[in-house]
Amino acid sequence: MNAKKEARLRRARRARAKIREQGVSRLSVNRTPRHIYAQIISPDGGQVLASASTLDKSLREGSTGNSDAAAKVGALIAERAKEAGITEVAFDRAGFKYHGRVKALADAAREGGLEF
């Protein structure tokens, strides 16, 4: 594993430890060069309560690796969280910089009604 990925995973571990202490559901984001994924995970970490990604049938058309697609995923995860009765989450960016696609997803989720 290269140093850049190790540093990202180290940041992610620290953030997840702090989120675990808070005892709230977390909005976990994972990004690849082609897709972006979002999951709302229960406070104990044992269950996925809602999920959305650019692989969903409704979002698959068009480009999937840009900020516009990430914003659509953010809006969709906020909608699915409301259906599951979740309004407050902790944002887990998995060590990725809060910039670009990660920021677009977070902003869209906030606009959709999620608080973090």
From Swiss-Prot:
UniProt xrefs under Gene3D superfamilies: 3.30.420.100
Pfam families, alphabetized: Ribosomal_L18p
GO cellular component, one term: cytosolic large ribosomal subunit
Keywords: Ribonucleoprotein, Ribosomal protein, RNA-binding, rRNA-binding
Keyword Protease: no
Entry keyword Ribonucleoprotein: yes
Any one GO molecular function term: 5S rRNA binding
InterPro entries according to UniProt: Ribosomal_uL18_bac-type, Ribosomal_uL18_bac/euk
GO biological process assignments: translation
Quaternary structure and partners: Part of the 50S ribosomal subunit; part of the 5S rRNA/L5/L18/L25 subcomplex. Contacts the 5S and 23S rRNAs.
Reported function: This is one of the proteins that bind and probably mediate the attachment of the 5S RNA into the large ribosomal subunit, where it forms part of the central protuberance.
PANTHER family: 39S RIBOSOMAL PROTEIN L18, MITOCHONDRIAL, LARGE RIBOSOMAL SUBUNIT PROTEIN UL18M
Family, per entry: Belongs to the universal ribosomal protein uL18 family.
UniProt protein name: Large ribosomal subunit protein uL18
